[in-house]
Swiss-Prot record:
Regions crossing the membrane: 38-64, 70-93, 111-132, 154-174, 202-227, 244-266, 284-304
Extracellular topological intervals: 1-37, 94-110, 175-201, 267-283
Compositional bias per record (Low complexity), positions renumbered to this chain: 335-351
Family matches, as PANTHER family: C5A ANAPHYLATOXIN CHEMOTACTIC RECEPTOR 1, CHEMOTACTIC RECEPTOR
Compartments reported by the entry: Cell membrane; Cytoplasmic vesicle
Membrane topology summary: Multi-pass membrane protein
Organism of this sequence: Mus musculus (Mouse)
Biological function: Receptor for the chemotactic and inflammatory peptide anaphylatoxin C5a. The ligand interacts with at least two sites on the receptor: a high-affinity site on the extracellular N-terminus, and a second site in the transmembrane region which activates downstream signaling events. Receptor activation stimulates chemotaxis, granule enzyme release, intracellular calcium release and superoxide anion production.
Protein name per its UniProtKB record: C5a anaphylatoxin chemotactic receptor 1
Post-translational modification (record): Sulfation plays a critical role in the association of C5aR with C5a, but no significant role in the ability of the receptor to transduce a signal and mobilize calcium in response to a small peptide agonist.
Topology feature Cytoplasmic, residues: 65-69, 133-153, 228-243, 305-351
Name of encoding gene: C5ar1
Keywords: Cell membrane, Chemotaxis, Cytoplasmic vesicle, Disulfide bond, G-protein coupled receptor, Glycoprotein, Membrane, Phosphoprotein, Receptor, Sulfation, Transducer, Transmembrane, Transmembrane helix
Disulphide bonds in the chain: 109-188
Similarity field: Belongs to the G-protein coupled receptor 1 family.
């Protein structure tokens, strides 16, 4: 069998492997830890400690409401996506701590790092679905009163998850564990095969456009119309969920921006570029910043749930339940309340 051509292993923004000719082959002297890696370790720790219990609490609260409330279905699926990513953090933490060497099996190399991409696609597709729901509630209230229900919501979430899995396929297909030529340690990386540069560019473009640019443009247009309609009609009764969703959307784009920028730069810069080496040093930090998005949503829900005095008197589940509860659409619909939109008394909402 021909020896592996290590030149085909390109450093990419969705893995944590590295190939550094400055590392001694005997592996005795480990490379100096980069400041970005130190920051990433701190961020991973905080995200895990906040994200796992926070998202688990949201899942627990919304699971009881999901049978009758559309909003609960949206936020339940968001929390599940974030929780899955947070559960992979101990493995990623260990990898960064060990200078990006991989000490787990090949299956874990394929699955666990890919969870961050699955989270990205699932989150943005779910946010787009939630935003479309908000848009229709404001501009088509009568249609929503007749059609909107839990069955349709579950179907929309199912479509979002299937699309997210399909978009994550390149990471599953091209990711593998291999022996680093210089250090003889195992590295979890991406192998696009011969002539990998065009494939790497194509994957980077797909990730940028589907996971960031197109959703950003679409959601900006959507929320511009929603805000104009809300302000013009002073529909203050329907703004609670709108504010929560907008906060979640804004945080998504803020925390994923560094990840997307460095990803495109790594895909486009030639291997010999000095700039590429500098960008690669920020890779772990940018991934960790994207991970912050996995723990920030429960914090938003708590902040939006009640006033500060109310927070002191109410339990966290009650606060989250209040933040994610259904609200009326405002003046456009006279009786558009949870009882008329989400209960089983509406006509059948078959999936």
């Amino acid at each position: 069998m021909d020896p592996i051509d290590n030149s085909s292993f390109e450093i990419n923004y969705d893995h944590y492997g590295t190939m550094d000719p400055n590392i001694p082959a005997d592996g005795i002297h480990l490379p100096k830890r980069q400041p970005g890696d130190v920051a990433a370790l701190i961020i991973y720790s905080v995200v895990f400690l906040v994200g796992v219990p926070g998202n688990a609490l949201v899942v627990w609260v919304t699971a009881f409401e999901a049978r009758r409330a559309v909003n609960a279905i949206w936020f339940l699926n968001l929390a599940v996506a974030d929780l899955l990513s947070c559960l992979a953090l101990p493995v990623l933490f260990t990898t960064v701590l060990n200078h990006n060497y991989w000490y787990f099996d090949a299956t874990a190399c394929i699955v666990l790092p890919s969870l961050i991409l699955l989270n990205m696609y699932a989150s943005i597709l779910l946010l787009a679905t939630i935003s479309a729901d908000r848009f229709l509630l404001v501009f088509k209230p009568i249609w929503c009163q007749k059609v909107r229900g839990t069955g349709l919501a579950w179907m929309a979430c199912g479509v979002a998850w299937v699309l997210a899995l399909l978009l994550t396929i390149p990471s599953f297909v091209y990711r593998e564990a291999y022996k680093d030529f210089y250090s003889e340690h195992t590295v979890c990386g991406i192998n696009y095969g011969g002539g990998s540069f065009p494939k790497e560019k194509a994957v980077a473009i797909l990730r940028l456009m589907v996971g960031f640019v197109l959703p950003l443009l679409t959601l900006n247009i959507c929320y511009t119309f929603l805000l104009l309609r809300t302000w013009s009609r002073k529909a203050t009764r329907s703004t609670k969920t709108l504010k929560v969703v907008m906060a979640v959307v804004i945080c998504f784009f803020i925390f994923w921006l560094p990840y997307q920028v460095t990803g495109v730069m790594i895909a486009w810069l030639p291997p010999s570029s000095p700039t590429l080496k500098r960008v690669e040093k920020l890779n772990s930090l940018c991934v960790s910043l994207a991970y912050i998005n996995c723990c920030v949503n429960p914090i938003i829900y708590v902040m939006a749930g009640q006033g500060f005095h109310g927070r002191l008197l109410r339990s966290l589940p009650s606060i989250i339940r209040n933040a994610l509860s259904e609200d009326s659409v405002g003046r456009d619909s006279k009786t558009f309340t949870p009882s008329t939109t989400d209960t089983s008394t509406r006509k059948s909402q078959a999936v």
